[in-house]
Amino acid sequence: MTAIRPGSVTFENVTKKFGNFTALPNLSLTVEPGTLVTLLGPSGCGKTTTLRLLAGLEHPTSGRILVGGKDVTNLPANERDVSMVFQSYALFPHMTSLENVAYGLESSGFKKNEARERAEEGLKLVGLGGMGHRLPAELSGGQQQRVAVARALVLEPQVLLLDEPLSNLDARLRRRVRTEIRELQQRLGFTADYVTHDQDEALAVSDTIIVMKEGGIAQKGSPRDLYEAPASAFIADFMGEANVVPCEVISAENGEAVIRVAGLTHRVPARNAQPRPAQLAIRPNAVTLQPQAGGGFSGTVAHSAYLGDHIEYEIETEHGKLFIVDPAVEQSLPLQTDVSIQFKTRGLAIINQ
């Protein structure tokens, strides 16, 4: 394999309709070369349609798609200089790992010997050197996934597309393989467009996350930006659970805001907040609970569940039920206990209305 040539991706006012249904209404986005960008969102948000448009498996109703600055809008899939890793891996069961990786090269016109050499190099690249003789059935789920990645990379695409590549793996293997994908992408420097509905997966692998909703971009930013500074209640709750309650921003200056919640004042990062009514996103682990509620923000224990290293509570308050994660597992709070809710310094974000 020669050096990776990472390419940029640009969608310019792309609309995709299926009959009378508009899956993507006027979508514009940019992916910088050498970055891993994740399209994240609930089912039906348009993330897979976006990936399929980029792959050439669908064509836009209007707008332009560029890869590496080249207009590929009307090009077939095999002329776009992108490779895709499918959710099912799509490995041929009767072919060895080496034959699977070499297949795309041979189909592209490489001589058999050169295709085999490149395939062997590709397998080494993903940590499967010496395993080219094995059939897919003789590999673990994680190894099959790496064969699929190797098959895509040996074609030396400008952009690698990954369509929910970890969805068929169990939770423990998923964590390990997502780390391997991220390390490989950083080591080789290729551009990757990654689709998932798993927030933890997106946070772990991405340079940039694009959260999609109803065919549009709800928010784009780094994993830290989206988690710590959500632009809306939807983003706050989607990027890890969040309790959203009304608040009033009293003042905001020098990067710090003073807010009032349930009659009590608190200091939180301002993040462009303005003095006016707003909402406060509260992460489940951003509060402590104290028995015997006094004034201010208080509630009653409605439900608790012991999960080994933490206890999950539902607290009934005047603003509805709050979901709280408490690492203090020595003794759980009994049901119907009145509690005061105290904020920690992290895990709070103002959402401007």
From Swiss-Prot:
Gene that encodes the chain: fbpC
Sorted UniProt keywords: ATP-binding, Cell inner membrane, Cell membrane, Ion transport, Iron, Iron transport, Membrane, Nucleotide-binding, Translocase, Transport
Entry keyword DNA-binding: no
GO cellular component assignments: ATP-binding cassette (ABC) transporter complex
Catalyzed reactions: Fe(3+)(out) + ATP + H2O = Fe(3+)(in) + ADP + phosphate + H(+)
Main localization (coarse): membrane
GO molecular function annotations of the record: ABC-type ferric iron transporter activity; ATP binding; ATP hydrolysis activity
Subunit text: The complex is composed of two ATP-binding proteins (FbpC), two transmembrane proteins (FbpB) and a solute-binding protein (FbpA).
Family to which the UniProt record says this protein belongs: Belongs to the ABC transporter superfamily. Fe(3+) ion importer (TC 3.A.1.10) family.
Segments forming domain ABC transporter: 9-239
Top-level taxon in the UniProt lineage: Bacteria
Membrane protein topology class: Peripheral membrane protein
SUPFAM superfamilies, per database record: MOP-like (SSF50331), P-loop containing nucleoside triphosphate hydrolases (SSF52540)
Protein name: Fe(3+) ions import ATP-binding protein FbpC
